[in-house]
A protein has these predicted regions:
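Generic recognition of long tandem-repeat/solenoid scaffolds
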Residues: 56, 114, 128-139
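Short, contiguous acidic and Ser/Thr-rich linear segments
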Residues: 50-72
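Short loop-to-beta-strand transition segments
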Residues: 75-129
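Charged, low-complexity intrinsically disordered regulatory segments in eukaryotic signaling
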Residues: 1-51
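Preference for intrinsically disordered or flexible, low-complexity segments
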Residues: 22-25, 56, 86, 90, ...
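Non-catalytic macromolecular-recognition regions in eukaryotic signaling proteins
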Residues: 33-36, 51-57, 76-78, 83
Length: 139
C-alpha cells in the first residue's frame, strides 16, 4: 500500500511536545483515520536529506492510524535534526556572503545536507516487504 500525501512536516507538527490531535486534521480524501498498521511497534527508515539512513522504532497503541504514522514521522525528523545539532561542529547555515541557498552539509551524527526541517514535506509513505515503513520526502 502506498499513500500519496504531500503534507508539509512543519505544518503537521512543530516540536515533540506539540503533537497535533489527528482528529483536528483532515487529510486529502479524509484518510487520517485509515488503519495502516496493526503492530504495537513500527519501524520507519529515514534517508533524506541524510548522509546515512536511520531506522527508528516507535511504540504506540495498535492499530496505527495514518495520522499516528505521520506524527511518528514528524517526531522522528525532529529527533534526527536535534541529534545533528547536538553532534555537529560545522554551522548549519551558510555565511551571509555565500551563494549557497540551501542548508550546508553538517558533520553531525546524520550528516544532514541541503535542507532545514521546515523545507521538508511528506510526498508518500509505503511499507516495504520487510515491514519497515519507507518515505518519499520532498523539499
Amino acid at each position: 500500500m502506498k499513500v500519496d500525501l504531500n503534507i508539509h512536516i512543519m505544518s503537521w507538527m512543530c516540536r515533540e511536545d506539540d503533537v497535533i490531535d489527528p482528529d483536528l486534521i483532515q487529510l486529502k480524501n479524509n484518510h487520517e483515520q485509515m488503519i495502516v498498521d496493526i503492530s504495537e511497534r513500527i519501524s520507519i527508515r529515514f534517508d533524506y536529506p541524510l548522509s546515512h539512513s536511520v531506522l527508528l522504532q516507535f511504540d504506540g497503541k495498535k492499530p496505527w492510524r495514518l495520522a499516528d504514522l505521520i506524527n511518528a514521522i514528524c517526531a522522528g525528523y525532529v529527533k534526527i535534526y536535534d541529534e545533528e545539532d547536538e553532534t555537529r561542529t560545522l554551522p548549519a547555515s551558510a555565511p551571509l556572503d555565500s551563494i549557497l541557498v540551501n542548508r550546508p552539509k553538517t558533520d553531525g551524527k546524520h550528516g544532514i545536507w541541503g535542507h532545514i526541517l521546515n523545507d521538508l514535506y511528506i510526498e508518500s509513505i509505503y511499507k516495504g516487504s520487510d515491514g519497515v515503513w519507507l518515505l518519499d520526502i520532498g523539499s
